[in-house]
């Protein structure tokens, strides 16, 4: 199974066998991610980092992943200090960076930007989030977290929060459909999962339930995946204010959950998870954040042909 020169744009491109291969590779590389051993697997390779939106975990974990494997990182830095501020197109920027890097990780505010970039790129494009579209590398780390901390086959999971604009949820739904998951969607009506995604999931014969209140699902799920309300994607601030405080995960709520329930969150969080949850056995989101390093190590090594 070869991933060499493969663009990582959407989870729709991956079979279960391909996903499992990435997860297995990440598990093999995890000791390197923890700094227990060193690696020169990507020595002499350069990762181009183009972020048109803010990021902490995705950007730093990609850069850490590249450096843990002995490679180098070439970062765009501030968009305002680049030729993009002069009107350079994304296509031209990608063509230019092709001459400098062996792969490009791209985050952009416009849905479809990663696909567009891949059409002009001679090196692999790794989509680190395209507007409200997809975030496949986050999904890989989410699946890895679930496998390490719970189980994938026959999983019962609740996805709660902003399901309309939350790109991590969009990608995760597609992947979970390959594992026969039972998915409960928890959100206000204004933030429902887009109809086209729901229709697609139902066509895959996945068990899907939509509810408005997490209290109606908390007792029965293995994993609770929480997302923040994506304030920056609301065209109308008044609409954001209507739903801003629609979800709160508290220790009191979790008393009703299974003892083995894991609470996940792609972060950053705002006020949807009470900080007191951090000290419970259910909190899994900081482990989840770390798992981004071995997963992105695996993806980088695979698309650059250092591993098969």
Curated annotation (Swiss-Prot):
Q: Which Pfam families match?
A: OTCace, OTCace_N
Q: Gene3D superfamilies from the entry?
A: Aspartate/ornithine carbamoyltransferase
- Work out whether the entry's keyword set contains RNA-binding: no
What does the record give as its pathway? Answer: Pyrimidine metabolism; UMP biosynthesis via de novo pathway; (S)-dihydroorotate from bicarbonate: step 2/3
What residues bind carbamoyl phosphate, as annotated?
57-58, 107, 135, 138, 267-268
Top EC group = transferase
> Residues of the signal sequence?
none
Instruction: List the Gene Ontology MF annotations in alphabetical order.
Output: amino acid binding; aspartate carbamoyltransferase activity
Which GO cellular component terms, listed alphabetically, does the Swiss-Prot or TrEMBL entry include? cytosol
Q: Which InterPro entries match?
A: Asp/Orn_carbamoyltranf_P-bd, Asp/Orn_carbamoylTrfase, Asp/Orn_carbamoylTrfase_sf, Asp_carbamoyltransf, Asp_carbamoyltransf_Asp/Orn-bd
- The residues that hold L-aspartate are 86, 167, 228
Q: What is its EC number?
A: 2.1.3.2
Instruction: Give the record's keywords alphabetically.
Output: Pyrimidine biosynthesis, Transferase
Function as written in the Swiss-Prot or TrEMBL entry: Catalyzes the condensation of carbamoyl phosphate and aspartate to form carbamoyl aspartate and inorganic phosphate, the committed step in the de novo pyrimidine nucleotide biosynthesis pathway.
Q: How does it assemble?
A: Heterooligomer of catalytic and regulatory chains.
HAMAP family according to UniProt:
Asp_carb_tr
Q: What is this protein called?
A: Aspartate carbamoyltransferase catalytic subunit
**Species of the source:** Methanococcoides burtonii (strain DSM 6242 / NBRC 107633 / OCM 468 / ACE-M)
């Amino acid at each position: 199974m070869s991933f060499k020169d493969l663009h990582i744009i959407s989870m729709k491109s991956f079979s279960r066998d391909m996903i499992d291969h990435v997860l297995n590779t990440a598990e093999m590389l995890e000791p390197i991610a923890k700094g227990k051993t060193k690696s020169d697997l990507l020595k002499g390779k350069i990762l181009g980092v183009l972020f048109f939106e803010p990021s902490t975990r995705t950007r730093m974990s990609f850069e850490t992943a590249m450096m843990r494997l002995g490679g180098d990182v070439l970062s765009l830095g501030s968009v305002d200090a680049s030729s993009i501020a002069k009107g350079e197109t994304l296509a031209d920027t990608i063509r230019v960076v092709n001459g400098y890097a062996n792969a490009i990780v791209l985050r952009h505010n416009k849905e479809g930007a990663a696909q567009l970039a891949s059409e002009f790129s001679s090196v692999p494009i790794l989509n680190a989030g395209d507007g409200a579209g997809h975030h496949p590398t986050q999904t890989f780390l989410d699946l890895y977290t679930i496998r390490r901390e719970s189980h994938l086959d026959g999983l019962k999971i609740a996805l709660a929060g902003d399901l309309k604009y939350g790109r991590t949820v969009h990608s995760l739904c597609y992947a979970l459909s390959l594992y026969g998951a039972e998915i409960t969607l928890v959100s206000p009506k204004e933030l429902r999962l887009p109809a086209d995604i729901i229709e697609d999931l139902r066509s895959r014969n996945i068990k899907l339930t939509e509810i408005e209140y997490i209290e109606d699902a908390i007792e029965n799920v293995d994993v609770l995946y929480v997302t923040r309300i994506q304030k920056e994607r609301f065209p109308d601030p008044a609409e954001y204010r209507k739903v801003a405080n629609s979800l709160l995960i508290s220790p009191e709520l979790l008393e009703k959950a299974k003892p083995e329930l894991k609470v996940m969150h792609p972060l950053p969080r705002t006020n949807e998870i009470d900080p007191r949850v951090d000290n419970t056995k259910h909190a899994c989101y900081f482990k989840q954040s770390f798992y981004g390093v071995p997963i992105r190590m695996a993806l980088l090594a695979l698309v650059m042909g250092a591993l098969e």
